[in-house]
């Protein structure tokens, strides 16, 4: 799913597919080819009543994904696919098998403030969420050096509490092309597969 469905890449709107929803479908297709049952939620959570509202989007997204998890309780992994926002001169690109590939970043909410846990944002899956990101980060360092940026930790929850294996993944930034972002889906699907199968 995509809390921020309106996030696009450098070649949008000329390339009408250069957005995170199309990117998510690409990842879903690759995972299906590996034998996974994938539900790709293409709902728009960040554009309501004719206005872009990225802060309220997490509330809307929680309602949406909670409903889906009730409907499909066998879902074990929940991925929120985004693209980052960086300064215009920043290029988040590496090369994998000769292909220019957008760098990815695992983004983890800690449900913590400097004073301790944020009581109104409990996350019983916090350790498992962090372990999931760290497993993929470590695997990527060995198999796809340069693919991942540092794991980003922030104080809120970002709906990662819904499953033990939840991840918010930033794929490139607004300065990347869609082709670069799409190229990152193959190694990302491979990392997910290896972590989930333990192989």
Each model region followed by its residue ranges:
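N-terminal catalytic or cofactor-binding beta/alpha core of small enzyme domains
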Residues: 1-76, 84-90, 186, 196-198
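Loop/turn elements at helix/coil->beta-strand transitions in domains of secreted/extracellular proteins
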Residues: 34-37, 73-77, 101-103, 146-147, ...
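Structural recognition of the beta-strand scaffold that forms the well-ordered cores
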Residues: 38-41, 77-80, 105-107, 150, ...
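Active-site-proximal beta-alpha loop/turn segments in soluble metabolic enzymes
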Residues: 44-51, 116-123, 170-172
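Alpha-helical scaffolding within the catalytic cores
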Residues: 65, 88-94, 151-157
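A short, glycine/acidic-enriched catalytic loop
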Residues: 87-124
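Active-site-adjacent substrate-binding region
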Residues: 125-152
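Active-site-adjacent mobile loop/cap segments within catalytic or ligand-binding domains
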Residues: 146-199
């Amino acid at each position: 799913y995509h809390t921020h469905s309106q996030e696009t890449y450098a070649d949008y709107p000329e390339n009408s597919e250069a957005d995170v929803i199309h990117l998510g479908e690409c990842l879903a297709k690759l995972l299906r080819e590996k034998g996974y049952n994938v539900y790709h939620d293409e709902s728009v959570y960040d554009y309501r009543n004719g206005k872009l509202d990225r802060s309220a989007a997490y509330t809307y997204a929680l309602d949406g994904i909670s409903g889906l998890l009730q409907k499909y309780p066998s879902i074990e992994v929940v991925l929120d696919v985004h693209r980052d926002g960086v300064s215009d001169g920043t290029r988040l690109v590496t090369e994998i098998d000769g292909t220019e590939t957008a760098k990815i970043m695992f983004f983890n909410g800690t449900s913590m403030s400097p004073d301790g846990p944020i009581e109104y944002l409990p996350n019983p899956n916090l350790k498992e969420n962090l372990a999931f990101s760290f497993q993929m980060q470590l695997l990527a360092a060995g198999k796809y050096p340069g693919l991942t940026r540092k794991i980003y930790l922030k104080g809120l929850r970002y709906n990662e509490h819904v499953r033990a294996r939840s991840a918010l993944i930033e794929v490139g930034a607004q300065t990347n092309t869609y082709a670069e972002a799409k190229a990152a889906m193959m190694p990302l699907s491979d990392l997910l597969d290896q972590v989930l199968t333990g192989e």
